[in-house]
């Protein structure tokens, strides 16, 4: 089975630099406490690492 990441936006984007806002939007997160499921690959991991202070991440088998 392929691994996937369950990503939830837990902190607000107010006052954050524009590159962090763009990264969160690229992950598919628009609203606070919204959760999305993304493939576990190097590109997604890089984006998660960039905004790890704003999100929570869980690995799931899907």
From Swiss-Prot:
| InterPro entries in the record | Ribo_uL30_ferredoxin-like_sf, Ribosomal_uL30_bac-type, Ribosomal_uL30_CS, Ribosomal_uL30_ferredoxin-like
Q: Which GO terms describe its molecular function?
A: structural constituent of ribosome
Supply the source organism for this entry. Shouchella clausii (strain KSM-K16) (Alkalihalobacillus clausii)
Assigned protein family = Belongs to the universal ribosomal protein uL30 family.
Q: Which UniProt keywords apply?
A: Ribonucleoprotein, Ribosomal protein
Subunit comment for this entry?
Answer: Part of the 50S ribosomal subunit.
Extract the Pfam families matched here: Ribosomal_L30 (PF00327)
Question: What Gene Ontology cellular component terms go with this record?
Answer: cytosolic large ribosomal subunit
Q: Signal peptide position in this chain?
A: none
Q: Which GO terms describe its biological process?
A: translation
What is the name of this protein? Large ribosomal subunit protein uL30
Q: Does the keyword Ribosomal protein apply?
A: yes
Give the NCBIfam families listed for this entry: rpmD_bact
**Highest taxon, organism lineage:** Bacteria
Q: What gene makes this protein?
A: rpmD
What HAMAP family does its record include? Ribosomal_uL30_B
Cross-referenced CDD domains: Ribosomal_L30
């Amino acid at each position: 089975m392929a691994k996937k990441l369950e990503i939830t936006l837990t902190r607000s984007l107010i006052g954050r630099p524009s590159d962090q806002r763009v990264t969160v939007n690229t992950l598919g997160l628009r609203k606070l406490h919204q959760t999305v499921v993304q493939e576990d690959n190097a590109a997604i991991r890089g984006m998660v690492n960039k905004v790890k202070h704003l999100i929570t991440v869980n690995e799931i088998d899907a």
